[in-house]
From Swiss-Prot:
Organism of provenance: Clostridium acetobutylicum (strain ATCC 824 / DSM 792 / JCM 1419 / IAM 19013 / LMG 5710 / NBRC 13948 / NRRL B-527 / VKM B-1787 / 2291 / W)
UniProt-listed InterPro entries: AAA+_ATPase, ABC_transporter-like_ATP-bd, ABC_transporter-like_CS, ABC_transpr_CbiO/EcfA_su, ECF_ABC_transporter_ATP-bd, P-loop_NTPase
Main subcellular location of this protein, as a coarse class: membrane
Protein name as catalogued: Putative ABC transporter ATP-binding protein CA_C0773
EC number(s) recorded for this UniProt protein: 7.-.-.-
PANTHER family found in the cross-reference section: ENERGY-COUPLING FACTOR TRANSPORTER ATP-BINDING PROTEIN ECFA2, HEAVY METAL TRANSPORTER
Amino acid sequence: MIKLEKVSFTYKNRAALCDVNVDINEGEAVAIIGPNGSGKSTFLKVLNGILFPSSGRYVFDNNEINENTLKNNKFLKLFHKRVGFVFQNSDAQLFCSTVFDEVAFGIMQMGLEGEEVDKRVRDCLKLLNIEKLKEEHPYNLSGGEKKRVAIASVLAMNPEVITLDEPMNAIDPKGKRFLKELLIDLNKSGKTIICATHDFEYIEGVFNRAVVFSENHKIIRDDRYENIISDREFLMECNII
């Protein structure tokens, strides 16, 4: 479903990704692990078509994703319907005047009818347990509440692939447990989950695979999640713990 071939990304002459090769199949739950500055966020932004490889190829469902293909508005809308992104900083994706409007914004761009929009929004608000916040301004919410709104706005699009950048940040322990169970349920329903994280305590049982980035912005290990997390010597050598 997702294939990166020798992908590198350079920003202002500084490498952020180096020669990345990875395949992710439909329905997998993959943790993206690495020390700060190793390229995890850049990797997710490439997957979402926010950044484009400086070299190499990114192929999604047999279509190469680059600046030219995403200039096609029809293809762009379809791509962003199929691949959703929850940013590390929720403020970066919350801009509407109410929570209800925030969750409705993306699906309204898809041309859905009012009744369908209303149903999807209400279903997602209920799923994230934020129905009581529907008339609130997103900027007045706590960090954990903002994260739930951001996730609801992505789920309203019903994407096949859900990518998340450090979703446990700014969430209290109860919220982290809720999010863990949500990710497990979403994956069981067939969603592909790709998540950058360092919060290992709260994500046990979510992922079946982990991809590890090094401080040199390269993938240095791709293995079962349990094998990597149990290898404390490896994690310490990589400056992850």
